[in-house]
Amino acid sequence: VMNVPVTFPPQRNVQRMVSGFLSPGIDKAAYPDELRDYLQSIDYKLDANPKLGHDEDKSDFIEDAHETLDARYEAFKHYIQQDDWDLFFGVFMTTDRVNHFLYKHYEEDMEYKDEFVEFYRKVDRYLGEIRRNLPDDVTMMVASDHGFTSLDYEVHFNQWLADEGWLSYEDDDHEDLNDISEDAEAYSLIPGRFYINLEGREPRGSVPESEYEAKRDQLKEALENLEGPNGRKVCDRVVEKEEAFHGDHEDIAPDLVAIPNHGFDLKAGFKGHDDVFGHGPRNGMHSFDNASLFVDDPDATIRDVDLYDIAPTILDLMEMEYDAGEFDGKSLV
C-alpha cells in the first residue's frame, strides 16, 4: 500500500506500506525499515511541494512535480516486480498538484499548457509500462476520486454568511470556530459544509430546535440563489444531510452540503475577507462529475459507476468472499 492519502500511521498487518498525504515524513510513514531505507535511497517524496506552485514562474514547481512522479514510478515498479503480492495499491498524487496550478493553462491555451500535457504524457507512459510488466492473471485498475475543472473564483462562505447576517463574532479578532458569537445562526466548514448553530448541539447554539427546519430551508434557498460576479449560480445543488449521510455518526453530519458548479471553489475560514469572491494561487479545482475509471478486464461494466463500487470490484477480482449487503457499492465484474 503506497502513498494512499490520510493513512498515517502505516499499518503493520500488510507486507509493505508507506502512508501518503498528511504524513509527517518517510522516516515515520514507511513500514518496514527496509522500505523506508529504499525510498530514501531513491529520493522518494510523499508529495510534491505545492508552495512552489504559488510562484508566477512555475518552472521550479514543474521540475519538482516530475521528480516526485519519477521516484514514485521507480518505487512502484521495484516492488511490483520484486514482491509476491495479492493486491498492490499505489497512488500517483502529483496529478492533483499539477492540476491545481496548471489546469487553466491547459484548458485555455495559456503559458504552461505544453508542460501540462507533457506531464500527463509521462503519467500515461508510466501507467502503460506498469501494465505491460504485470503478469497475465493480474487485473489493473486506474481510478481518480474526483475530476478537475478550471477555477474562476474562490468563494469565502463565512464572509458571505457574515454579510447576510447569519454569522457574527465575539469581537474583531476572530480566526476560528470558537470565536463565533452566541447570536450566530450558521457557519461553514470546507468543503461546502453548512451547520445551523443549533441549541443543545453546538457549544454556543442560538437557534431553537423549533426553528431548525425553517432556518435550514431559508439558508438552503439563499445558497441555491447565490450568483457569482460572472452571473453564474455558485451551487449546482444543495443537499440536506438526511439525503447525504447515513450511519453511526450521522449526528455530526453538516445540515447542508453545497455542491459547486464548475469554476467555484468553496472556502471557509473564520479570519474574514474583504470580499466574498476572490482569487488565490490555484487555477484548477476539484469537480465531482468527471472522475475517471479504467478496469483492464473484458467483463467489467463501466456504466453508472460510483466510487463505492471499487472496493467490491477488487474483492471480486481477488475471488474473496464478502457480504454484498455490507457495501454501499456493487461489483463491476
Give residue ranges: language-model regions.
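His/Asp/Glu-rich, glycine-adjacent segments
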Residues: 1-108, 185-186, 190-205, 211, ...
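Active-site neighborhoods of enzymes that stabilize oxyanions during catalysis
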Residues: 1-5, 170, 175-301, 307-313, ...
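Acidic, His- and aromatic-enriched active-site or binding-groove loops in soluble protein domains
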Residues: 16-38, 108-117, 158-177
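Structural motif
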Residues: 87-91, 141, 294
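Extended hydrophobic/aromatic segments used for targeting, binding, or gating
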Residues: 101-129, 133, 276, 293
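Short secondary-structure boundary/capping segments
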Residues: 104-108, 154-163, 254, 272-275
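Metal-dependent active-site segment of extracytoplasmic phospho-/sulfohydrolases and closely related
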Residues: 120-161, 236-241, 249-250, 256-259, ...
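Cytosolic regulatory/linker segments at or just downstream of nucleotide-handling modules
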Residues: 326-333
